[in-house]
Curated annotation (Swiss-Prot):
Belongs to the SHO1 family. One of its GO terms (cellular component) is plasma membrane. This is High osmolarity signaling protein sho1. Residues 150-169, 185-229 are annotated as: Disordered. The keyword Glycoprotein does not apply. It comes from Aspergillus oryzae (strain ATCC 42149 / RIB 40). Residues 199-226 have a biased composition (Polar residues). Residues 230-289 form the SH3 domain. It is a multi-pass membrane protein. The keyword Cell membrane applies. CDD domains: SH3_Sho1p.
Length: 289
C-alpha cells in the first residue's frame, strides 16, 4: 500500500480546503448535536449515525489524499460518498426544521458537509482526463499538470525522467579494417589473431569481433537493461501505454492487462508480459495485485 505523506495534502489546495471545510462542518454538527440532545427533547437518534458516518468519511478521504490513491479506489470512494450524501441529507431534514437553535446549527453543519461531499463526488467520479480535474490538479505540487494529459492517458513524465538503466556505457567495438592501421601493436590476449608474435596475424582479421557484432553492440545494445530472472509481483494496467519508439527498453501494454513485475521500488518497473516480452513500465500506470 502507498505510504501516507502529509505533503500530498499540504501541497494540494483542493485537498487541504475540502478536508478543512469538512472538519469544520463535522465539528459544528457534532457540538450542536450534543447541545441539542441535552437541552431539547426528542433529538433524532438517527442523526448520531450521520455524525459518525461523516467522521469516517473525513478520515477515509484524508487517507486517500495523503496516499494519492484516488485514481485507484475512485469507484469505491464515490460509492461511500453517495451513501454519506443520503445520510447527511436525511440528517438535515430531521434537524433544520426544529425550533431550537442547536438543532438548526447541527442541520447547518450537515448541509455544509453535504456540499463538500457533492464536490468530492464530482471530482472522484470523473476520469483523470476530465478537464475540470486536470485544472484542479494543476494547483497541486505532487500531481500532473493539465499539460501532462494526452491521448487518453497521463504522461509518465509526471513521475520524473526514467533513471539510467546501465551502470556504464558499452565500449565502442572496432575491427582492424575500420581502424585502418591505428590499432595498437601491443599483444592483447583472449582475442582472435593468434598469440603475440604469431606470423599468422593478419590486419584484415577482426581483433574485436566481426563487423556485424561490433555494430550491433555499438548501436543496438548499449542501453539494454539486464533482464531479471524472477518476477515475484503481479500488476494490472490501469491505463494503456505506448512505448517510446526511441527507447528500446520500454514496453507497451493495454488497459487491464496483467504484467509480471520483478521490482517495485522505483518509479519505472521491470515487467514481463504474458507473451514473454520484457521491458520497463511507468509505475503510475500499474497497480499491484
Amino acid at each position: 500500500m502507498a505510504r501516507f505523506r502529509p505533503s500530498n495534502i499540504l501541497g494540494d489546495p483542493f485537498a487541504l480546503a475540502t478536508i478543512s471545510i469538512s472538519i469544520l462542518a463535522w465539528v459544528i454538527a457534532f457540538i450542536s448535536s450534543i447541545v441539542s440532545a441535552i437541552n431539547a427533547r426528542g433529538y433524532p437518534t438517527y442523526s448520531w449515525w450521520g455524525v459518525a458516518y461523516s467522521l469516517c468519511i473525513i478520515l477515509g478521504m484524508t487517507a486517500v489524499f495523503g496516499t494519492d490513491t484516488g485514481s485507484v479506489y475512485g469507484v469505491a470512494i464515490v460509492g461511500y460518498l453517495s451513501a454519506g450524501m443520503v445520510i447527511t441529507t436525511l440528517g438535515v431534514n430531521s434537524l433544520v426544521y426544529r425550533s431550537d437553535s442547536a438543532s438548526q446549527a447541527a442541520g447547518a453543519g450537515f448541509i455544509l458537509m453535504s456540499m463538500v461531499i457533492v464536490i468530492w463526488i464530482f471530482y472522484f467520479g470523473s476520469t483523470p482526463q476530465a478537464s475540470h480535474r486536470g485544472f484542479i490538479d494543476s494547483f497541486a505540487l505532487q500531481k500532473e499538470h493539465p499539460g501532462a494529459y494526452g491521448n487518453g492517458r497521463p504522461m509518465s513524465t509526471a513521475f520524473g525522467n526514467r533513471p539510467e538503466t546501465t551502470s556504464s556505457q558499452a565500449p565502442q567495438m572496432y575491427t582492424s579494417a575500420q581502424l585502418n592501421g591505428f590499432e595498437t601493436s601491443s599483444p592483447v590476449s583472449g582475442y582472435p589473431g593468434g598469440a603475440p608474435g604469431s606470423e599468422n596475424r593478419s590486419s584484415s582479421q577482426p581483433r574485436f569481433g566481426n563487423p556485424s557484432n561490433a555494430n550491433l553492440t555499438a548501436n543496438g545494445n548499449e542501453n539494454e537493461v539486464p533482464q531479471p530472472t524472477e518476477y515475484p509481483y503481479r500488476a494490472k494496467a490501469i491505463y494503456s501505454y505506448d512505448a517510446n519508439p526511441e527507447d528500446a527498453n520500454e514496453i507497451s501494454f493495454t488497459k487491464h492487462e496483467i504484467l509480471e513485475v520483478s521490482d517495485v521500488s522505483g518509479r519505472w518497473w521491470q515487467a514481463r508480459k504474458s507473451n514473454g516480452d520484457t521491458g520497463i513500465a511507468p509505475s503510475n500506470y500499474l497497480i499491484l495485485l
